[in-house]
Amino acid sequence: MAWKYTRRLEPLLDCVCDHDIGFQINCSYGNALRLTGDSTTVVPVYVAAAHKLADRFSPQAGVIKSWNFLRNDWVYPVIIDNMMNLELLTVGARLSGESALADIAGSHASTTLANHFRDDWTSWHLLDYDPENGSVRYRETVQGYAHGSAWSRGQAWALYGYTMMFRETGKEGYLEAAMNIGDM
């Protein structure tokens, strides 16, 4: 039964609308691989999804675009939720042997760390980047109480994302970030 519903997610590989493929495939196919060890069925879909997410990456900005829809004059919106998608790239790199996928995850995590957080380790929900030169056009909180407030769900995404990036890379800066985010 689980395979029946998991396989229904394969059409997501044709969607180019947002970053959610990371949540959707890692939570389904990632767990399928962990629970069944069926690399023949799982790995091709998992790696294809990692490539689909990687296609949303701007080397100039160093981050993965979250949404294609543009409102509020957005050009290249990146939301903190995207930290939850990086595991698709790191595991995809391990499964495929393609280190470029892990490099994209590292770039996104490091750029997000540099730009998304206030001095008190609360994060903005959304940053809009200039994809040509990587500059931050503006910061806002689309979900949450106010632009300057902490948004608990976003904090949770960041905490998980940096903990996972430490696990995957061993880089102490990611662990320190996770601890600071958790202590905010």
Question: For the regions a protein language model found, what residue spans apply to each?
Answer:
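Glycan-recognition and catalytic cores of secretory/periplasmic carbohydrate-active enzymes
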Residues: 1-184
